[in-house]
A protein has these predicted regions:
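Short, acidic, metal-binding catalytic loop of nucleotide-sugar glycosyltransferases
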Residues: 24-35
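Short beta-strand/loop segment that forms part of the nucleotide-sugar
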Residues: 34-45, 64-70
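Active-site-proximal specificity loops/subdomain of glycosyltransferases
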Residues: 51-96
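Short aromatic/hydrophobic "clamp" motif used to bind/position activated sugar donors
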Residues: 103
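Acidic donor-binding/catalytic loop of UDP-sugar-dependent glycosyltransferases
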Residues: 108-123
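Short beta-strand-to-loop element that shapes/binds the nucleotide-sugar donor at the catalytic cleft/hinge
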Residues: 130-150
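A recurrent flexible, glycine/aromatic-enriched loop bordering the glycosyltransferase active site
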Residues: 164-184
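C-terminal catalytic/acceptor-binding lobe
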Residues: 200-325
Length: 325
């Protein structure tokens, strides 16, 4: 089988991610014999769920259902007492398995709107880094991949929307790479060691990635036609994944920041972990990762055991024992 041109990474840790919506919406947009694979990275992986995802795909595109790679924050190898948010690790799992030269990440609980795939194809053809637009709505009814009815919600408006242009992608800065779908050449992502798992348990992994890509010389685009609509109800259902954002006294914060080689704080605000994520990447001006105990380009599933043995027992920010989280 020939390698695909685009790998779509769909990561989820939900009992009900709404994959049928995404599968139907994507299939409606694909041309015949589209060179695409969809990789479902599943934090709840089991054989029964594989059958369910395969049934939703219904043979309309190549599908692979894979377990999320081990993480100190989520899954069977976790060091924490409960599952935490670990989107960076899940997306890096997709990069381990992706076979295409271009990778697009799509959030669960969402349906791609009619121009989404065309925007992905355009970005892939030009080798561009692109952020798609999103909206979050309630009371969604999706029929065969088409959003039939929904209710708009002020909390679900993409803050970049007015920056966009319906006719073409526009340039944005690295810190504006976030949201429900974004894409980039796989080799570019591997060259900066993927997403930084320093962000796991906290968040900001997409914004931090955008800043690091910009430091690596990439141009970041925003394509308003690459739109997905996310269900507020599905997104809030089930057991929430823990997110933490601990604070330190100012002096301790600045001492910890200096450990990363940053002596002047670039941001203002609370002295918490989420600010330090940004302070480190902005203060160093580097694309380097600080939370990945491996080099992603060399990582294969057979090497996960060595990675697990290097997992930390404490949180990088404040030294808190992960077992107490």
């Amino acid at each position: 089988m020939s390698a695909p041109r685009v790998s779509v990474v769909y990561a989820t840790a939900r009992d009900e991610p709404g994959f049928r919506w995404f599968a139907d919406g994507l299939a409606r947009q694909l041309p015949d014999r589209a060179d695409v694979e969809v990789i479902v990275v599943d934090g709840r992986f089991d054989a029964g769920r594989s059958a369910r995802f395969e049934a939703d795909a219904a043979g309309r595109f190549a599908l692979r259902h894979v377990a999320a790679k081990p993480s100190p924050y989520q899954g069977p190898y976790r060091r924490t007492s409960r599952d935490c948010f670990a989107a960076a690790s899940a997306r890096n799992t997709g990069l381990v398995h992706a076979r295409a030269p271009y990778v697009v990440f799509a959030d669960d609980c969402s349906v791609p709107m009619p121009r989404w795939w065309r925007a992905v194809e355009r970005a892939a053809a030009h080798g561009e880094v692109v952020a798609g637009a999103y909206q979050k709505r309630s009371a969604m009814r999706v029929d065969d991949g088409v959003l039939a009815t929904s209710r708009a919600d002020d909390s679900g408006i993409d803050g970049r929307w007015t920056l966009g242009d319906d006719g073409r992608p526009v340039r944005i800065h690295g810190g504006q790479l976030y949201g429900a779908s974004f894409g980039a050449p796989r080799e570019l992502l591997l060259s900066i060691n993927g997403l930084d798992e320093q962000c796991d348990s906290i968040g900001y992994e997409d914004v931090q990635l955008g800043l690091r890509l910009a430091h690596a010389g990439a141009t970041i685009l925003y394509d308003r036609s690459m739109l997905t609509i996310e269900s507020l109800e599905l997104g809030s259902a089930g057991l929430p994944l823990l997110r933490v954002d601990p604070e330190l006294p100012e002096r301790e914060y600045r001492e910890r920041l200096a450990d990363f080689g940053v002596t002047r704080r670039p941001t203002q605000g609370r002295f918490d972990a989420s600010h330090m994520i940004l302070d480190v990447v902005l203060g160093t001006g580097s694309w380097a990762t600080h939370g990945n105990c491996y080099w992603l380009a060399d990582l294969v599933p057979d090497g996960y055991g060595d990675m697990v043995r290097r997992f930390p027992d404490t949180h990088w920010f404040d030294g808190c024992l992960l077992s107490t989280m």
